[in-house]
């Protein structure tokens, strides 16, 4: 039996949360090279967007589903918009962060973290983290991941 396109169980115009989250990851990843370059040149993580050399206002880095992208001590955190996105991810966040590794840096992606010192990050869960089920398998690192 042939299933016609109009028989699919999804509403017209409905976009899955994971597809919307991918925009947040792309926008956050867009800041990685600036953060890496700053770290390699200065030996410390950039404290904010301006020192990283990216848009000074976090709200200037935004998309259709993303409210803002913030750099804080080298941790790049993307926050979803409070409306116009899947209800399960409204206002929720994810982070990208790097750790030193053999003179270079290795990047991680997952639920929000905060940098406690040069080599350590801690979970920054406050009820505003994007549920792991909405994160792609490539973005499920934790603060403990090496």
Predicted regions and their residues:
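Periplasmic/extracellular, small/polar-rich flexible segments of pilin-like filament-forming proteins
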Residues: 40-146
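Amphipathic alpha-helical segments typified by the pilin-like N-terminal helix
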Residues: 1-38
């Amino acid at each position: 039996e042939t299933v016609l396109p109009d028989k699919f169980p999804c509403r017209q115009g409905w976009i899955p949360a994971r597809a919307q989250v991918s925009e947040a990851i792309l926008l956050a990843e867009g800041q990685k090279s600036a953060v890496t370059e700053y770290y390699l040149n200065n030996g410390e993580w950039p404290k904010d967007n301006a020192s990283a050399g990216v848009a000074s206002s976090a709200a200037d880095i935004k998309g259709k589903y993303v409210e803002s992208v913030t750099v804080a001590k080298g941790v790049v955190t993307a926050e979803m918009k409070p409306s116009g996105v899947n209800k399960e991810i409204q206002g929720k966040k994810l982070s990208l962060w790097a750790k030193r590794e053999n003179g270079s840096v290795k990047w991680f992606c997952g639920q929000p973290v905060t940098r406690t010192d040069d080599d350590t990050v801690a979970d920054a869960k406050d009820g505003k983290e994007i549920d792991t089920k909405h994160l792609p398998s490539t973005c499920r690192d934790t603060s403990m991941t090496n």
